[in-house]
Amino acid sequence: MEARAKVMKALAHPTRLFIVDELSRGERCVCELTEKIGADVSTVSKHLSLLKGAGIVLDDKRGVQVFYRLRVPCILNFFGCVEAVLEETSRQPVAIGE
């Protein structure tokens, strides 16, 4: 259960979700992600480090640049499941405390 929680925790941030979504289109260097996110390199690197530690992404250093890609593309299936939950919830709001 703790390993699952680690993966879920790594995905539990809007910036990291954006990174995973961006990597679904192919590998990206840190510089590209930094530009798209609008954050400094150290912040983006920290997010990538958490994703790597959870086994979600792999890195490949080429010269001075580091490129990242999804380790297991099926992680995107989780996004579809989240969308289904949100869609269902929007139809029938859940009362707090249920």
Show which residues each predicted segment covers.
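Amphipathic alpha-helical dimerization/coiled-coil segments
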Residues: M1-A3, I75-E98
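Regular, well-ordered alpha-helical segments
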Residues: A10, G53, A84-E87
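Short, hydrophobic-biased segments on the C-terminal half of alpha helices
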Residues: L48-S49
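Beta-hairpin "wing" of winged helix-turn-helix
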Residues: K52-R62, R69
